[in-house]
Amino acid sequence: MSLKAFSWILLSAIAIGFILLFNYWASYQLLSTLAYAGIAAALGGLANAVIPFRFLGIRRRIVGVVILAGGVVLMVAALIWPAPMFRVGHPQTYLDDAMPEYQFWEKHSVRIHARPEQVMQAVRQSTFGDMKSLSMLLKIRSAGLRTPSQSTGALAADRRILDAFSASGYVSGGGEHEIVTCGGANVPARRPLKPRSLEECASYREPGAIKVAFNFTAGDAGQGWSVVSTETRVLATDDVTSRGMGRYWRLIVPGSGLLRRQWLAGIKRRAESEP
């Protein structure tokens, strides 16, 4: 096998592995995947425009320039693509009632060897310490946005996550096997929404707002097992805000998905440690 063929096979395997890992975190968000694929292609093209990768059969810098341009076009197209509106036809959960319309979403689940009641208790007790990558991702976000990092006290490792959301103006509700939290912010006014109930959060339509709702549900899977799922939904209440949120969401959703995976892992450890 030639070096060129081996290099392309290795590069393809790495790309496939990256895409699978990326989508494991990001719940198969196509536009986010395409945006990051465009970024990777642009960086690869830039490198080839400087020094062509001859081991891949690329011998001219112009090829790198073409790859760079194609990557930029793909990235921009994925980031500015209009977000579709999803509507719940027949509400089945408290989350459906709190957020029946949304443009952005992610969902994750895990099996836990514990009863649903133990799982929901573990959800309530989960802390920021469960999110191992939170500090690193916040530093990256702050550097990218050129804003101060979140105060360490607000995100202390032993602080309960749901308590922090409540302190930020989010409202919670639900039932025995479902917890729903809803809130958000008015972007132009730079203030939190602070709804007084899930119903008020659902009906809020003031322009410039971004509403966020997420839930945890636990279902009996038999033989002492449960399936816990968490879904996040986001609604921007006008077109301008939706376009901005679309760009932001497609860039941050891999990190968001990673944190939710870690959150679920912490819930699993806590629930399975109960007698």
Question: Each PLM stretch: what is its role?
Answer:
Residues 12-52:
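Membrane-embedded alpha-helical segments of integral membrane proteins
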Residues 34, 44, 244-275:
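A conserved amphipathic terminal alpha-helix motif
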Residues 55, 77-171:
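Hydrophobic ligand-binding cavity/cleft-lining segments
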Residues 62, 199-255, 267:
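Beta-strand/loop substructures that line and gate deep hydrophobic ligand-binding cavities in soluble
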Residues 126, 184-186, 208, 245, ...:
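Glycine-rich, low-complexity intrinsically disordered segments
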